[in-house]
From Swiss-Prot:
One of its GO terms (biological process) is reductive pentose-phosphate cycle. Mg(2+) binds at K191, D193, E194. Coiled coil: none annotated. It comes from the Bacteria. It comes from Albidiferax ferrireducens (strain ATCC BAA-621 / DSM 15236 / T118). InterPro entries: RuBisCO, RuBisCo_large_chain_AS, RuBisCO_lsu_C, RuBisCO_lsu_C_sf, RuBisCO_lsu_fd_N, RuBisCO_lsu_N_sf, RuBisCO_lsuII. The record marks K329 as: Transition state stabilizer. This is Ribulose bisphosphate carboxylase. One of its GO terms (molecular function) is magnesium ion binding. Its EC number is 4.1.1.39.
Length: 459
């Protein structure tokens, strides 16, 4: 059935829709099944995403038609389709009237992902007006709160040197805490790897007190504050809160040094929002494990990593992983930096839409996945600043001298970039950074030809 007369209006102007502030706009790459009309398929997509179905129904009235989602732009050659969703379509909380991300996902990337006449459809960007931003929580804490704890300026406080306890599984409580202590002697921030939780060989109630003791000992030895991001992800929100409450009790007066990690893609929006609302005094660390099944460039359905990052800021993530922009082991490219810019700035041009955030707090780009000191200068060149958290597991625990030396090498890499120095020359005056060349020789060979001769290192 051709629904284009109802669910498409190509006379609508995007600028006018944005100025009106009464729609969420979504941009997709969409292709219909072979032989089908593009606009008809797009209109069916909009119908399925709002008030319609595959037939006319007798219960439709004039009010219903007023909240139809409308296709307002198509370009079949480039597979571009844009839809305007009236705000009235979206579900609101009965407790406080706020928007729910699950409603946005249900409509904008819900049933439409399995439609029989659609070959593929992937959301590449969306625009939310000021009213919608006001009706989401947004972050309660941001990187400035961590800089303050670390004794740094709260503006442009710089690189936070972090790690992930490795190996990701298999460490019992005492070795786990010792691994944390060894890194904290040189670094700032440790996160649980996302599978780490309450395994039978390392129960939280035994492990976490030992981790807190390691944090205090490292602080005493270095005279510097340390931070820990604890994984509270669980199927049951009561279990998640039980883990968080135990952690707060354990850390006591040092609770401000405790972040809560939620594996937000697998855990879902409800888990992220629960953590944000129940624990507004904690830095909310959004890990996105599993996202690649829909965000990967090889996937033509779902949504992009930039869309996920924008959603995380609306929900209130203090920080979210953004990959390594082609400099680590994970899939990505240099132009992924727009993802970082989108969540850290008050306004930013996305792939399609210019988004203003109207003063809500920023979300920190967290960089992780195969990074080490040798890869960081190039990463910073691409990003253009160092106001991030980097969690380098192998880059710390794979350093030949110690995890602490690995942490120091990461910091020295940032200082090298900030000084505009040549990494080889910098290494001659900074031992931990120099030893990173020997620790990661394959990266050294690829990035710094002739480094062995220049640093006097034998083959």
């Amino acid at each position: 059935m051709d629904q284009s007369k109802r669910y498409a209006d190509l006379s609508l102007q995007e600028a006018a829709l944005i100025a009106g502030g009464q729609h969420i706009l979504c941009a997709y790459k969409m292709a219909p099944k072979d032989g089908l009309n593009y606009l008809e398929a797009a209109a069916h997509f909009a119908a399925e995403s709002s008030t319609g179905t595959n037939v006319e129904v007798c219960t439709t009235d004039d009010f219903t038609r007023d909240v139809d989602a409308l296709v307002y732009y198509v370009n079949e050659a480039t597979e571009d389709m844009r839809i305007a969703y009236p705000l009235a379509l979206f579900d609101r909380n009965i407790t406080d009237g706020r928007f729910m991300l699950v409603s946005f996902l249900t409509l904008a990337v819900g049933n439409n992902q399995g439609m029989g006449d659609i070959k593929h459809a992937k959301m590449i960007d969306f625009y939310v007006p000021e009213r919608v931003i006001q009706m989401f929580d947004g972050p309660a804490k941001d990187i400035s709160d961590l800089w303050r704890i670390l004794g740094r300026p709260v503006k442009d406080g710089g690189f936070i040197v972090g790690t992930i306890i490795k190996p990701k599984l298999g460490l019992r409580p005492e070795p786990f805490a010792q691994a944390a202590y060894q890194f904290w002697l040189g670094g700032d921030f440790i996160k649980n790897d996302e599978p780490q939780g309450n395994q039978v060989f390392s129960p939280i109630k035994k492990t976490l007190p030992l981790v807190y003791d390691a944090l205090k000992r490292a602080q005493d030895e270095t005279g510097q504050a340390k931070l820990f991001s604890m994984n509270i992800t669980a199927d049951d929100h009561f279990e998640m809160c039980a883990r968080a409450d135990f952690a707060l009790e354990t850390f006591g007066a040092d609770a401000d040094k405790l972040a809560f990690l939620v594996d937000g893609f697998v855990g879902g929006p409800g888990m992220v929002t629960t953590a944000r609302r129940q624990y507004p005094n904690q830095y909310l660390h959004y890990h996105r494990g599993g996202h690649g099944m829909v965000t990967s460039p090889s996937s033509k359905r779902g949504y992009t990593a930039l869309v996920l990052a924008k959603m995380s800021r609306l929900q209130g993530a203090s920080g979210i992983h953004v990959g390594t922009m082609g400099h680590g082991k994970m899939e990505g490219a240099g132009d992924d930096r727009v993802m970082a810019y989108m969540i850290e700035r008050d306004e930013c041009q996305g792939p399609v839409y210019f988004q203003k955030w109207y003063g809500i707090k920023p979300t920190t780009p967290i960089v992780s996945g195969g990074m080490n000191a040798l890869r960081l200068p190039g990463f910073f060149d691409n990003l253009g600043h160092g106001n991030i958290i980097n969690t380098a597991g192998g880059g710390s625990y794979g350093h030949l001298d110690s995890p602490a030396a690995g942490a120091v090498s990461l910091r020295q890499a940032y200082e090298c970039w900030k000084a505009g120095a040549d990494p080889i020359e910098w290494a001659k005056e900074h031992r931990e950074f120099a030893r990173a060349f020997e620790s990661f020789p394959q990266d050294a060979d690829r990035l710094f030809a002739g480094w062995r001769d220049k640093l006097g290192v034998g083959a």
